[in-house]
Amino acid sequence: MHCVLARILLWFLIVDLSVIRALVLPPLKDYDPLEPLMKRDMAMGQRNRFKVDGQLPPILNSTDVTDDQRSLHTPGEIPSYVINHCPLVHLYSEEKYWPSDIAEYVQNFQIKDKNGNSISTHENLTLHDLKAEYHVDLFGNKTETHIPSSEVFLTSLDDFDKDPKWLLGHLPEYGTGYNSKAPAILIVVDKGNGWVDAFWFFFYPFNHGPFIMGHGPWGNHVGDWEHSLVRFYKGIPKYLWMSAHSSGTGYRYEAVEKFKKLRKRKQQDSDDGGDTILERPLIFSARGTHANYASAGQHAHDIPFFFMPLSDFTDRGPLWDPSLNFYSYTFDGKTVTPSSEREESLGLDWLHFQGGWGDQQLPARDPRQKWCVAQWKYIGGPRGPLFKKLDRLNLCGGVKKWNFWNGGCPARRLIKKAEGLDSESTDLMGDNCGVLLYRIRPKWLRGILRFLMWRGILCSLMEFFTN
């Protein structure tokens, strides 16, 4: 009885102190580190989501860019500023499935259609075996059947449920972030009028899905493509977008945390000067799912309110530098051009492969398969880089269904703060309430509303609509 009374008194004390803090502290100290930037944007009446400000030209679809509008004039040539601003990736400290090389990965598969018929004619696949379409004699009657690659899957030769060695990937080198066995994929797209999009793709052999209230994992799949987009205007980075599951988050480039890293000058570089220290953007890769976030901590997957049963977790684990090992290409909306002989040796057909980069979803009768209300344990593998909407004008790969405001993808001006023990607070982080709060005056009223909306539904709705 005494314990119950003590808990009740403690609860009232906490509530009283919280109310006093909400009523007294906000008028004395306003927690809006980038309020001048907000005021500037509001004064400009900025509504065009394809412009940084009223002085910059529009972004064009890559297929509509004329010769006079081109930002890149030599197919296959990768600008140095793209490499210099490549994101660094903090992998999770307890990660089990690390990055891998797609050329090594495909050797462990055969190609099958959705009915289980074998499409590949030999073992030890290479990237040259991945094509846009196939013509196969399925029934042994010397009649070829046309099968589009969208109807096939890479099917494991081993039981992936037992974690064969090739499924685990490779850990980057400590200190440098170099990963000799896991090249990233870089695709640079000319968006005209000085705009250039640099897509960095990160490949992991396996996606280990999240747990729901301690049960799972759910949504596992063999093969996992994640990516980030750095959008440049005349060589200056303006935006950064990072994928997370079927969507992602876009940021103004200045809003994202940076990491100083040394870039050694190569002997063949003709310009003067020695080694250079560059400020590179940081991305945090979530445990198992490899979803990308801009901060460390717990990130709500679908339900971002008081109750977060489905979450991703990030921390400052091993640092991976994709710019030290990558395959690179340029893409004009129609033609892919390799940047060197290394990429030419891999061929280009694999980029046009529309099939799943992992096994088809296991049937319910398979003993490895399990089901929960919203998800299966094992789902089908993802599609490859060329089918991630590289021709997008919007910063995001797609518009969030619930967010029609500002095109569904406004670029955030503050990092969305995570929850949990690994979460951090910096001057770049917002309080997870939308910029609608910045319009409220007087400040003491804003402070009260900020307190009342802390991790509340209304606050999260504003975050969705205003960033």
From Swiss-Prot:
Known glycosylation sites: 61, 124, 141
Induction: By 8-methoxypsoralen and UVA.
Subcellular location: Membrane
Gene disruption: observed consequences: Leads to cell death when overexpressing the camptothecin mimetic TOP1-T(722)A mutant.
Regions crossing the membrane: 8-28
Keywords of the record: Glycoprotein, Membrane, Protein transport, Transmembrane, Transmembrane helix, Transport
Chief localization: membrane
One cellular-component annotation, GO: cell periphery
InterPro entries: VPS_Associated (IPR053102)
Biological processes, Gene Ontology terms: protein transport
Keyword Transferase: no
Membrane topology per record: Single-pass membrane protein
Protein family (similarity comment): Belongs to the VPS62 family.
Classification via PANTHER family: PTHR48220, VACUOLAR PROTEIN SORTING-ASSOCIATED PROTEIN 62-RELATED
Described function: Involved in vacuolar protein sorting.
Protein name: Putative vacuolar protein sorting-associated protein TDA6
Native organism: Saccharomyces cerevisiae (strain ATCC 204508 / S288c)
